[in-house]
């Protein structure tokens, strides 16, 4: 099968099962697996939308303990004897009574060959309706606060009618609003400079009275009972009160001197929000949505002092360990994040500020709980408003496209073991025979909790081969390795659902089996390696991580390239490997690993989003797409992400996922400024100028978070966003004297892709390794 046909096959599997594997044939032995360099791993999107798939209204059939695998198309079913053999543990299980009518030609949906992914609606109801607690920063300008209030009031109409809503505001003090008290505005005030233990919060709010017990769930869709009912009200009953309270919100009255920052107690407000839900709604789906317009400057979790002369920490400060508040703040927010994750509650962070807000310190609140993270310049921006509204997108049945209180468990056959997960989750510390000896990401477990989950939430799951090799290792007949992903989550409709995805792939034959190399999915592999690199970058120095990326690339090319000894020019890669070095070139230059020109908050945001998206979107972040428009051809033409693609008579459309940029070449910009497009006879120029805008609108249509939209001209200041992403094939050092200018010259010391590939070829050929060891500054 040729590469294009394989790509189509992998794409069909992704559409059906929401999964992409780095290797689609598994090695037979651990030794063979170690020689692959790129680990056996999967990018899995549990809730990938499948509108044609039926929702089964009965409980799944599971194998006996301790296996607990769910019946799937790979199970061997004996219709006459009414038994099925589990492909994971090979145990025989009786079929339940309601399967009595099945025959060879009439089988239930979960046994159909195409039902490798199936979803069940479980009988177990959710313990409470979805809960939304808005935590609002009042230390902001009037116009920004008004815009935020308007957006929050609008969001009330997007919530399910039975959803519970609470409101906490904070500035110098944190206030919990008692929405159930209608006589006048009433709130409980917490001092911003004081750290409150969980029990203190609960005592002050009067939450220690008898409430719903964890093992006694209340009826779904009913309003809460007990003390929490004063603070959390159903939208359908209390929309008027909640709207009134939001409309009456005022700026924090505490005076702020010109040389000071506002006193902002973000840590106390978050601590109170976590404590409020922890007592009354443990393991019930809920979201704490934080809207902050500046850094925390007092109380627990503050990231900078109130004096403006004291700057926010930079990457340089962190590298030099010149960080006065950082470690204490991280410890505080991490403890809150663990509490929220253990209770099944999501924390979303929405920042509307030109300066940093402390996202770096708070990042694990979102990372541990599967929350959203959004970085915008202001709450007045359309980027914030449209992104926030998209959080509440609904499906065809008018249910929110979000799952609550989710967990993911991975089962494997004896050939495979799970080594870990990289994504927005925490470990459930569940041990089983599927758990591997090594650790990659969040390891030593086969189950993870990811309180918040949506249709684009994707996770990198990593595996190892269990077989040590030896004479008994290779067994006769076709062999396969299998994995099953079990995702339990609270659906927005009020019931728990279970989505089951079962994956089977062949095992390779003897050492040197060519099917192994042919099964390499370079796109999935690039994204999975990028996740490992970002995971490492959070704990290691940036240069060390880049060196690791380079080493892995050299080893992979050395293993799978064709070349002649001592001849770098003979270096060739098969079609399914050719783009991988290019992906790694752009990854090592990306904002995920290069922190220069980015604040720590921006780096935390970019890495958060990368770990949330599937293969297609993550690849756009690593290697942006570039399209060209000109009068010579109709529509857009994909072009190389290279400085040579900049032409005076062309318009370029760059998509980096975070930015959508339209760049007008020098001549096009002059024509536009002269107004030719508005004159008769120049309709083709007008159409040319409009086409990239139309395409940009399509790109923006379903993207979260909404990207920043930039329109610029050659030579303009905003053009730097494009130039920083291009391969610098034409720099100030490469142009010949007096040569004609046909492309943009980029002033940079970065090496070009061609130079990078030249060095890769030298390093990948073992006998050439000594030749390049004497290079002064090898780029790889």
Curated annotation (Swiss-Prot):
Full protein name: Protein transport protein sec23
Species whose genome carries this gene: Neosartorya fischeri (strain ATCC 1020 / DSM 3700 / CBS 544.65 / FGSC A1164 / JCM 1740 / NRRL 181 / WB 181)
Described purpose of this protein according to its UniProt entry: Component of the coat protein complex II (COPII) which promotes the formation of transport vesicles from the endoplasmic reticulum (ER). The coat has two main functions, the physical deformation of the endoplasmic reticulum membrane into vesicles and the selection of cargo molecules.
Gene that encodes it: sec23
Assembly behavior: The COPII coat is composed of at least 5 proteins: the sec23/24 complex, the sec13/31 complex, and the protein sar1.
GO cellular component: COPII vesicle coat; endoplasmic reticulum exit site; endoplasmic reticulum membrane; Golgi membrane
Main location: cytoplasm
Residue ranges of coiled coil: none
One GO-annotated biological process of the protein: intracellular protein transport
Keywords of this entry: Cytoplasm, Cytoplasmic vesicle, Endoplasmic reticulum, ER-Golgi transport, Golgi apparatus, Membrane, Metal-binding, Protein transport, Transport, Zinc
Family per similarity comment: Belongs to the SEC23/SEC24 family. SEC23 subfamily.
Subcellular location(s) of the protein: Cytoplasm; Cytoplasmic vesicle, COPII-coated vesicle membrane; Endoplasmic reticulum membrane; Golgi apparatus membrane
Recorded topology in the membrane: Peripheral membrane protein
Keyword Transport: yes
Entry GO MF terms: GTPase activator activity; zinc ion binding
Entry binding sites for Zn(2+): 63, 67, 86, 89
């Amino acid at each position: 099968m040729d590469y294009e046909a394989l790509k189509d096959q992998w794409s069909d599997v992704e559409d059906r099962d929401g999964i992409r594997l780095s290797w689609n044939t598994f090695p037979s032995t651990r030794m063979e697996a170690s020689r692959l360099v790129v680990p056996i791993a999967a990018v899995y999107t549990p809730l990938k939308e499948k509108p044609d798939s039926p929702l089964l209204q009965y409980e799944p059939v599971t194998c006996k303990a301790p296996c607990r695998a769910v019946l799937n198309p790979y199970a061997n079913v004996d219709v006459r004897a009414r038994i099925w053999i589990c492909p994971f543990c090979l145990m025989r299980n009786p079929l339940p009574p309601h399967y009595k009518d099945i025959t060879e030609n009439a089988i239930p949906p979960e046994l159909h060959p195409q039902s490798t992914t199936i979803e069940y609606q479980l009988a177990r109801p959710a313990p409470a309706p979805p809960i939304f607690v808005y935590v609002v920063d009042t230390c902001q300008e009037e116009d920004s606060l008004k815009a935020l209030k308007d957006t929050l009031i609008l969001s009330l109409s997007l919530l399910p009618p039975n959803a519970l809503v609470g409101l906490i505001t904070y500035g110098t003090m944190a206030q919990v609003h008692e929405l159930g008290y209608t006589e006048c505005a009433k709130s409980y005030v917490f001092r911003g400079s004081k750290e409150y233990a969980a029990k203190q919060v609960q005592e002050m709010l009067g939450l220690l009275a008898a409430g719903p017990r964890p093992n006694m769930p209340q009826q779904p869709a009913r309003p809460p009972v007990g003390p929490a009912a004063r603070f959390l009200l159903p939208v359908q009953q209390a929309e008027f009160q909640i709207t009134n309270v939001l409309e009456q919100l005022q700026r924090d009255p505490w005076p702020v001197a010109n040389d000071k920052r506002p006193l902002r107690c973000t840590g106390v407000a978050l601590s109170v929000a976590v404590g409020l839900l922890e007592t009354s709604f443990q393991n019930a789906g809920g979201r704490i949505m934080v809207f902050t317009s500046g850094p925390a400057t007092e109380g627990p979790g503050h990231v900078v002092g109130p004096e403006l002369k004291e700057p926010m920490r930079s990457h340089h400060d962190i590298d030099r360990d010149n960080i006065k508040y950082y470690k204490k703040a991280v410890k505080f927010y991490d403890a809150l994040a663990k509490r929220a994750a253990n209770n099944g509650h999501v924390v979303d962070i929405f920042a509307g500020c030109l300066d940093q807000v402390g996202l770096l310190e708070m990042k694990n609140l979102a990372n541990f709980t599967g929350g959203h993270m959004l970085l915008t310049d202001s709450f007045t921006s359309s980027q914030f408003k449209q992104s926030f509204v998209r959080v509440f997108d609904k499906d065809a049945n008018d249910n929110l496209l979000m799952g609550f209180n989710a967990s993911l468990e991975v089962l494997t056959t004896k050939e495979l073991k799970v080594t870990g997960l990289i994504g927005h989750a925490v470990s459930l510390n569940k041990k089983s025979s599927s758990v591997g000896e090594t650790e990659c990401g969040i390891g030593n477990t086969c189950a993870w909790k990811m309180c918040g989950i949506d249709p684009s939430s994707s996770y990198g799951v990593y595996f190892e081969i269990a077989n040590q090799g030896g004479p008994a290792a290779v067994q006769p007949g076709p062999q396969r390795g299998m994995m099953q992903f079990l995702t339990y989550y609270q659906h927005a409709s009020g019931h728990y659902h279970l989505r089951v995805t079962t994956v089977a792939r062949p095992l390779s034959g003897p050492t040197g089996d060519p099917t192994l190399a042919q099964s390499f999915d370079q796109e999935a592999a690039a994204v999975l390696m990028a996740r490992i690199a970002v995971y490492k970058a959070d704990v290691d120095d940036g240069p060390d991580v880049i060196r690791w990326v380079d080493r892995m690339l050299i080893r992979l090319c050395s293993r799978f390239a064709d070349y002649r000894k001592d001849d770098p020019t003979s270096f060739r890669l098969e079609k399914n490997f050719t783009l991988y070095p290019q992906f790694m070139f752009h990854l090592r230059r990306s904002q995920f690993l290069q922190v220069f020109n980015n604040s720590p908050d921006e780096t935390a945001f970019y890495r958060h989003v990368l770990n949330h998206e599937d293969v297609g979107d993550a690849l756009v972040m690593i290697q942006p797409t570039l399209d060209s428009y000109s009068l010579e051809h109709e529509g857009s033409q994909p072009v190389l992400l290279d400085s040579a693609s900049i032409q005076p008579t062309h318009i370029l459309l760059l998509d980096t996922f975070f930015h959508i940029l339209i760049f007008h070449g020098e001549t096009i910009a002059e024509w536009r400024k002269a107004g030719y497009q508005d004159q008769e006879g120049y309709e083709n120029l007008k159409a040319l100028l409009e086409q990239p805008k139309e395409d940009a609108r399509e790109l923006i249509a379903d993207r979260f978070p909404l990207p920043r939209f930039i329109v610029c001209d050659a030579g303009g200041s905003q053009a730097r966003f494009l130039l920083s992403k291009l391969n610098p094939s034409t720099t100030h050092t490469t142009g010949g004297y007096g040569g004609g200018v046909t492309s943009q010259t980029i002033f940079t010391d970065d090496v070009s892709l061609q130079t990078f590939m030249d060095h890769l070829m030298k390093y990948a050929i073992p006998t050439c390794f000594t030749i390049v060891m004497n290079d002064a500054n090898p780029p790889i």
